[in-house]
Amino acid sequence: MARRIEPSKKSIPDILGDLRSGYREAVIIGPSAALKFLERTQESQHSLPNAVKCFLFDLLAETRAQLGDWEGCNEAVKGALANLAAAESDLGAELKNSLPGMSLFERGIAARSELGDFEGALQLCDEATARGLGAHFEAKRASLAWAR
């Protein structure tokens, strides 16, 4: 009797690498193709690790912002924030290196401002500043201070 071939189990960093690679290929075509890739990945990967979901939602936020879908962008930012703790625990060094280039804070602030949720935009400024992402977010916060 033949032995059953066990499915290969990828590591979380490998899964993240696959996500980024697929996104890079799709985004060359344009944001609509990137959105399609990300939505298909989200739908088909029911067991996607939460740490990778953080990055997926971040890419969704960027793509939806490029398409002017501010409500979708805001929802993606919420998803990224909900999975941020998992990314910190499972991909700590990768997240630390990637966070300055990620879109969730920048695009989240823009989305919430576009939707009139200035308090939410200020909260994102505070969280970005608390994570050490720099004076850029302090300046954004100062420019939104009138909303309080």
Per-range role (PLM):
Residues 26-40, 70-88:
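Helix-turn-helix repeat elements of alpha-solenoid scaffolds
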Residues 10-24, 48-68, 78-81, 85, ...:
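Amphipathic alpha-helical repeat scaffolds of TPR domains
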Residues 78-85, 117-135:
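TPR/TPR-like (Sel1-like) alpha-helical repeat modules
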Residues 49-51, 86-92, 130-141:
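Boundary/linker segments of alpha-helical solenoid repeat arrays
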Residues 52, 72, 95-103, 133, ...:
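Structural signature of alpha-solenoid helical repeat junctions
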Residues 35, 54, 74, 119-122, ...:
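Conserved positions within tetratricopeptide repeat
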Residues 6-9, 42-49, 129-132:
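Solenoid-like repeat scaffolds
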